[in-house]
């Protein structure tokens, strides 16, 4: 693949100051089941003290892109609170901001965004009249990765493209979840199909497909034209992958940007890191991966920091009065936790968690404000926020029993536990859960 960007071709400052970023953060993430019943997927916790959307937003700031709009829709309350408290530090007087663009009632009485393209279209008047960008970078707010978007912007301008799509190589067996493309030697897209049942392989790589990352750079005027045209198309699904990108392809305006050119997070073997944590298994695994000695994703890297809004909690404390208890091993522990004579291994614990005597927590992701009683055994679990695990409960030991009590992942490996499930087990009547996430 030919390298498009040449040193000194563009003034990076002029490029980023004329770019508006739109982060699409309105999705539910239905494959995460009860984990996203009360929160949008981008607001889901990740890595001990962050939210998923913090990765896309941190990439923007680290790339010098400080004009950001976050498009919200489904169960947006916790996401909006997170943005207000954790991402309001940019100086408005310098034209820098993280603005929130929630779904709102239109003149034609439509209230919900009908697709990814419609989410941008319904905000087009604001974009044109208020932000007035020359380029628009569109991101999904629910992926885990580190990327310098300014490199992609430079490639976009140098290529002469009207639209550039971020791409990554994935195993062909997984490519049916994404848009799949073929490119020529100059990275011009020659074919594109959204979520094909039988994904085409890359030339010379029969087990690999080139897929869309859901990241697009548009010349602003070209995007306005394409969205005006798309909204009037019969039987449209109002989706970038299904409707807009194929039209860009027909016009010869679509180019690809390989993620390897702008990736800022590589593992010790030099492999690029990008995760779509859209299932219980992938969410659990991506968190558990962080506890290894040399994780694929380095959350401690100060050269490309992942910002957020960590809870201001007291330091965690550990009491071990019995020598036969194996203490904490290979785990991430958030602030404000109290651990008493409990064994914790290969797990990610968020903030304000209490674990009582002689309990064992192994390969678990435990979200904030969970209480785990005495003599409990938890293995391969995702424990949702504010769960209270009663004394002696075992989860992840007898899968047949767990199937009747909790949510089991599609692979049968991971168990999701929520407060509602625990209340049903206790025989309590279930009303509306009203906690602020």
Curated annotation (Swiss-Prot):
Q: Which CDD domains is this protein grouped with?
A: ADP_Glucose_PP, LbH_G1P_AT_C
Enzyme Commission code: 2.7.7.27
Q: Which SUPFAM superfamilies match?
A: Nucleotide-diphospho-sugar transferases, Trimeric LpxA-like enzymes
Pathway it acts in?
A: Glycan biosynthesis; glycogen biosynthesis
- Role description: Involved in the biosynthesis of ADP-glucose, a building block required for the elongation reactions to produce glycogen. Catalyzes the reaction between ATP and alpha-D-glucose 1-phosphate (G1P) to produce pyrophosphate and ADP-Glc.
- Native species of this protein? Haemophilus influenzae (strain 86-028NP)
- In terms of superkingdom, the source organism counts as Bacteria
Gene Ontology MF term list: ATP binding; glucose-1-phosphate adenylyltransferase activity
| Record note on quaternary structure | Homotetramer.
What protein does this entry describe?
Answer: Glucose-1-phosphate adenylyltransferase
For alpha-D-glucose 1-phosphate, which residues are the binding ones? 113, 179, 194-195, 212
Q: Which PROSITE patterns match?
A: ADP_GLC_PYROPHOSPH_1, ADP_GLC_PYROPHOSPH_2
Catalyses which reaction(s): alpha-D-glucose 1-phosphate + ATP + H(+) = ADP-alpha-D-glucose + diphosphate
Family classification: Belongs to the bacterial/plant glucose-1-phosphate adenylyltransferase family.
Q: Which GO terms describe its biological process?
A: glycogen biosynthetic process
Q: Which UniProt keywords apply?
A: ATP-binding, Carbohydrate metabolism, Glycogen biosynthesis, Glycogen metabolism, Nucleotide-binding, Nucleotidyltransferase, Transferase
* Top-level taxonomy: Bacteria, Pseudomonadati, Pseudomonadota, Gammaproteobacteria, Pasteurellales
